[in-house]
């Protein structure tokens, strides 16, 4: 299925489908007129004698140098080749696809001045699976994501490297195998392509989409744990959350209540609730903590969908034909959003790890055996799995330090304040990988704890989740080589397989 993009109106759901499902995207035909109009205006300026930044001048600190009209194409090519300075491992294909899509959206507004042929090449690369090799490091998130975007454009001009049919090859070879032709850049086109926040925004969106899946997995794991330790659900009563008023807290409490509603374990200790209202905070305060995390993700989503629809290169062509230099390439909004997402990921993992610790400690687990082990002592059960979760939680705490506060001057002090959005967003991927494992460990431990409550059963919804879990991972009856179990649990959480057996009861990630 091809997703047709209407710049300025692209939705979070469309971008999520591109990220998770690899959907191909293209611009709506209605964008073509504005694109042509912008390109004509740039061609008009390039043919004149007036120096205009980015069209017939040097770049950055060299902006005062006028470039001869005959050298404009060379200028644009040199710009791309000289800026291909990113280093590190290649970004994942789904992130590069998302990045290319975001660049299409930006160009589709008609304010960048590129030719329609260039847009069509980018669309064709997406459609035919020519995926530029883009090293992950090298952007400071101001004056755009220059280095990573330059690697994308390098393939468009027959340089650089690309993946085609999962094989890494030269950019020229990839285009040839896809029956596409490299393009010669004209005035401003190179700058329009590499000036922009699309790499940072793609990474932040990936962190957001993964983080939302982790949050839902954390809510599910938290419900399982609540039943495993015979926790009180009185703190999930909707009215107390309505009295506070935070949207995330309200919808999270509703979700937890639905997940546990018809549990036999829950019914068996209802009469004891008067004595159990003081459960540890990791059980009792789930709506407050996870609700706040959800609200943070929603706020970040609001910023990122605006940025996804934005024009962020420089200079820009206004509707009256005026060309104005500004600073839309500065990715501070993206950097702040990435930092906010990092805080939420850190807290989702923190409260999950505390619930794991609760279940393995027989002094507070309401009758569960030490470390959830049968014949404890001979068997260690979840002893070291809990330590693994603690290690990953601590790692995420360190990565949650805000990246946006760490500006440094660059480019001979011309670009003297930068956002650090790119690595601030990229670290979300590592945090989510840790988080999927933490939640996976909690899910395994909670399922084991619930099985100790037999013959009492958990809720019908949680039974369906446990049934899906046990298709992949057996109950831990005696100690065994656990690493494969943790890996499988990680995959189940990351891919949303456990969530897929449930009805749509989780709050939607939609900007309010």
Swiss-Prot record:
Contains an active site 4-methylidene-imidazol-5-one (MIO), which is formed autocatalytically by cyclization and dehydration of residues Ala-Ser-Gly. Gene3D superfamilies: Fumarase/aspartase (Central domain), Fumarase/aspartase (N-terminal domain). GO terms for cellular component: cytoplasm. Keywords: Cytoplasm, Histidine metabolism, Lyase. One of its GO terms (biological process) is L-histidine catabolic process to glutamate and formamide. InterPro entries: Aromatic_Lyase (IPR001106), Fumarase/histidase_N (IPR024083), HutH (IPR005921), L-Aspartase-like (IPR008948), Phe/His_NH3-lyase_AS (IPR022313). There is a cross-link at residues 142-144 (5-imidazolinone (Ala-Gly)). It is found in: Cytoplasm. It comes from the Bacteria. GO terms for molecular function: histidine ammonia-lyase activity. It is an enzyme of class 4 (lyase). It holds the Pfam family Lyase_aromatic. The modification 2,3-didehydroalanine (Ser) is found at residue 143. Pathway: Amino-acid degradation; L-histidine degradation into L-glutamate; N-formimidoyl-L-glutamate from L-histidine: step 1/3. Its EC number is 4.3.1.3. It catalyses: L-histidine = trans-urocanate + NH4(+). The keyword NAD does not apply. Belongs to the PAL/histidase family. PANTHER family: HISTIDINE AMMONIA-LYASE. This is Histidine ammonia-lyase. It comes from Bartonella quintana (strain Toulouse). The lineage of its organism: Bacteria, Pseudomonadati, Pseudomonadota, Alphaproteobacteria, Hyphomicrobiales. The gene is hutH.
């Amino acid at each position: 299925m091809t997703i047709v993009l209407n710049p300025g109106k692209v939705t979070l759901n469309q971008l999520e489908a591109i990220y998770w499902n690899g959907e191909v995207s293209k611009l709506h035909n209605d964008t073509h007129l504005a694109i042509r109009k912008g390109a004509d205006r740039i061609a008009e300026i390039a043919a004149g004698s007036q120096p205009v930044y980015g069209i017939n001048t040097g770049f950055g600190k060299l902006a005062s140098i006028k470039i001869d009209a005959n050298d404009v194409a060379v200028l644009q090519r040199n710009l791309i080749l000289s800026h291909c300075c990113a280093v590190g491992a290649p970004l994942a294909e789904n992130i590069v696809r998302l990045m290319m899509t975001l660049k299409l959206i930006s160009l589709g507004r008609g304010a960048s001045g590129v030719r329609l042929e260039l847009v069509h090449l980018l669309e064709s690369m997406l459609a035919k699976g020519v995926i530029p090799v883009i090293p992950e490091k090298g952007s400071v998130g101001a004056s755009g994501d220059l280095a990573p975007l330059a690697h994308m454009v390098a393939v468009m001009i027959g340089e650089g490297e690309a993946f085609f049919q999962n094989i890494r090859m030269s950019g020229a070879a990839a285009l040839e195998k896809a029956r596409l032709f490299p393009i010669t850049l004209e005035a401003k086109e190179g700058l329009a392509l590499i000036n922009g926040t699309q790499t940072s925004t793609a990474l932040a969106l990936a962190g957001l989409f993964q983080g939302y899946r982790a949050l839902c997995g954390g809510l599910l794991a938290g419900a399982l744990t609540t039943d495993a330790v015979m926790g009180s659900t009185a703190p999930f009563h909707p009215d107390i959350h309505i009295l506070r008023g935070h949207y995330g807290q309200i919808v999270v409490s509703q979700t937890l209540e639905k997940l546990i509603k018809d549990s036999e374990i829950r019914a068996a200790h209802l009469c004891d609730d008067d004595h159990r209202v003081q459960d540890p905070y990791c059980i009792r305060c789930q709506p407050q903590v996870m609700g706040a995390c959800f609200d943070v993700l929603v706020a970040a989503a609001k910023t990122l969908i605006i940025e996804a629809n934005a024009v962020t290169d420089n200079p820009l062509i206004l509707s009256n034909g005026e060309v104005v230099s500004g600073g839309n390439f500065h990715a501070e909004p993206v950097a702040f959003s990435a930092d906010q997402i990092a805080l939420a990921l850190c807290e989702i993992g923190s409260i999950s790890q505390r619930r794991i610790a609760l279940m393995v400690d027989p002094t507070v687990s309401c009758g569960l055996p030490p470390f959830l082990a049968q014949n404890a002592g001979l068997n260690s059960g979840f002893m070291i799995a809990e330590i693994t979760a603690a290690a990953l939680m601590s790692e995420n705490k360190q990565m949650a330090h805000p990246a946006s506060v760490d500006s440094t001057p660059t480019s001979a002090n011309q670009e003297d304040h930068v956002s650090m959005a790119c690595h601030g967003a990229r670290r979300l991927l590592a945090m989510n990988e840790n988080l999927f494992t933490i939640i996976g460990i909690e899910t395994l431990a909670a399922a084991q704890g619930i099985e100790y409550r037999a013959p009492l059963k958990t809720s019908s919804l949680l039974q369906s989740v446990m049934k899906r879990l046990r298709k992949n991972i057996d109950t831990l009856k005696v100690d065994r080589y656990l690493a494969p179990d943790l890996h499988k649990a990680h995959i189940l959480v990351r891919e949303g397989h456990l969530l897929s057996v449930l009805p749509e009861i989780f709050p939607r990630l939609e900007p309010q």
